């Protein structure tokens, strides 16, 4: 059942460039001038699914918006600069994507970003709760394992929390898993789908290779190496960029893929499945990423973990303590805010 549904969204990204799709989504990008924000905004501007694109940052947004506005696609683009302009950026939005925050540098974990990015995410999501409480909120800012609990607690404080509308974007883990499996097996990566569950950092990233479509088999040593590469792929890019940033282009692609899937589902397309880090009852963690069936109102049905191998069970068991700690850290941050 799941594998039949779960041929997600490489197709959504391709379809988003066709002109037959409905063009009505009002999308805001918060952190639009950054390394992820600029290429993400370009991909969104290029899609006929988007009718209005509002860009926010604390620097350079008028320039980014002016540049993008010259592209011959239908989305109307406007830039907003600084906190006093944020409410206008958010009004009437259907989807808000938040890549804002500082990137990783060599030697840093995603968790090292916590102190800076926690404040940024709490501030931006408070504005969302006030000015577009009904919008879908897609969090890219790391550490996602903590920034999603932060977002949820902020929305609860404002009395507008809806767990079906807040998503931690883990799509890059799926994109990487698909790519690496395809490389090893000589397959077309656009036709490979590996569900990745758990969280979005290190060993909390759990690729379910046993559920890959098409079915693939690896010897245990190769499976362990492949899993490790998927888990540490972000660090691979940070090292390769040698201090010049983290994964920006692939993250922008993955973020756009998730947004297009979400908008497709909001437009009434059926059978749209993406993995995302959301409030969950699938494990003892209050948030957990699994394949989700998306619908007109966001998360329609959590499709759960499904049948897994002992190797995958062990990875889940090992990830849960770290995930619980990251979730608590995010929740405590909001509870202790002045």
UniProtKB/Swiss-Prot annotation:
Broad class of enzyme this protein falls into:
oxidoreductase
Modified positions (N6-succinyllysine) in chain numbering? 78, 91, 185, 203, 215, 239, 269, 296, 301, 307, 314, 324, 328, 335
SUPFAM superfamilies in UniProt: LDH C-terminal domain-like (SSF56327), NAD(P)-binding Rossmann-fold domains (SSF51735)
Q: What activates or inhibits this protein? A: Enzyme activity is enhanced by acetylation.
Q: Which Gene3D superfamilies match?
A: Lactate dehydrogenase/glycoside hydrolase, family 4, C-terminal (3.90.110.10), NAD(P)-binding Rossmann-like Domain (3.40.50.720)
Q: Which GO terms describe its biological process?
A: aerobic respiration; gluconeogenesis; glyceraldehyde-3-phosphate biosynthetic process; malate metabolic process; malate-aspartate shuttle; tricarboxylic acid cycle
Annotated substrate binding lies at 104, 110, 142, 176
Give the sites modified to N6-malonyllysine: 239, 307, 329
The record's principal subcellular location, in a coarse class, is: mitochondrion
Q: Which reaction does it catalyse?
A: (S)-malate + NAD(+) = oxaloacetate + NADH + H(+)
Q: How is it modified after translation?
A: Acetylation is enhanced after treatment either with trichostin A (TCA) or with nicotinamide (NAM) with the appearance of tri- and tetraacetylations. Glucose also increases acetylation. Acetylation of Lys-239 and Lys-314 is observed in liver mitochondria from fasted mice but not from fed mice.
Q: Does the keyword Phosphoprotein apply?
A: yes
Where, by residue number, is the active site? 200
Q: Which GO terms describe its cellular component?
A: membrane; mitochondrial inner membrane; mitochondrial matrix; mitochondrion; myelin sheath
* Keyword field contains Transit peptide: yes
Positions bearing carbohydrate: 33
Task: Give the residues the record marks as binding NAD(+).
Answer: 31-37, 57, 117, 140-142, 251
Q: Which InterPro entries match?
A: L-lactate/malate_DH, Lactate/malate_DH_C, Lactate/malate_DH_N, Lactate_DH/Glyco_Ohase_4_C, Malate_DH_AS, Malate_DH_type1, NAD(P)-bd_dom_sf
Q: Using the record's annotations, give every residue carrying the modification N6-acetyllysine.
A: 78, 91, 165, 185, 215, 239, 296, 301, 307, 314, 324, 328-329, 335
Q: How does it assemble?
A: Homodimer.
- PANTHER family, per this entry? MALATE AND LACTATE DEHYDROGENASE, MALATE DEHYDROGENASE, MITOCHONDRIAL
Family the UniProt entry places it in:
Belongs to the LDH/MDH superfamily. MDH type 1 family.
Return the protein name: Malate dehydrogenase, mitochondrial
Q: What is the species of this protein?
A: Mus musculus (Mouse)
Gene giving rise to this polypeptide: Mdh2
């Amino acid at each position: 059942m799941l594998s039949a549904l779960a041929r997600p969204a490489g197709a959504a990204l391709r379809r988003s460039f066709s002109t037959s799709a409905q063009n009505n989504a009002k999308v805001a990008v918060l952190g639009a001038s950054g390394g992820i924000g600029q290429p993400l905004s370009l991909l969104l501007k290029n899609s006929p699914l988007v009718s209005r694109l509002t860009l926010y940052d604390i620097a350079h947004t008028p320039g980014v918006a002016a540049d993008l506005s010259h592209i011959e696609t239908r989305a109307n683009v406007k830039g907003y600069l600084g906190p006093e302009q944020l409410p206008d950026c958010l009004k009437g939005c259907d989807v808000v994507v938040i890549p804002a925050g500082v990137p990783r540098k060599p030697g840093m974990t995603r968790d090292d970003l916590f102190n800076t990015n926690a404040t940024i995410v709490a501030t931006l999501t408070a504005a969302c709760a006030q000015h577009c409480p009904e919008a879908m909120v897609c969090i890219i800012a790391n550490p996602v394992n903590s920034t999603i609990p932060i977002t949820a607690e902020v929305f609860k404080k404002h009395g507008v929390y809806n767990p079906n509308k807040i998503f931690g974007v883990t799509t890059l883990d799926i994109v990487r898993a698909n790519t690496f499996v395809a490389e090893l097996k000589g397959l077309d990566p656009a036709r490979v789908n590996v569900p990745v569950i758990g969280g979005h950092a290190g060993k909390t990233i759990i690729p379910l290779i046993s559920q890959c479509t098409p079915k693939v088999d690896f010897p245990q040593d190769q499976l362990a190496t492949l899993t490790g590469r998927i888990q540490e792929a972000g660090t691979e890019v940070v090292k390769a960029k040698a201090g010049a940033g983290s994964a920006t282009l692939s993250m922008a692609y993955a973020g756009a893929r998730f947004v297009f899937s979400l908008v497709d589902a909001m437009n009434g397309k059926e059978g749209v499945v993406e993995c995302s880090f959301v409030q969950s009852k699938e494990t003892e963690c209050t948030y957990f990423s699994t394949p989700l069936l998306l619908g007109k109102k966001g998360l329609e049905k959590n499709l759960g973990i499904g049948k897994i191998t002992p190797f995958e069970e062990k990875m889940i068991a090992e990830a849960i303590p770290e995930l619980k700690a990251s979730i608590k850290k995010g929740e405590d941050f909001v509870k202790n805010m002045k």
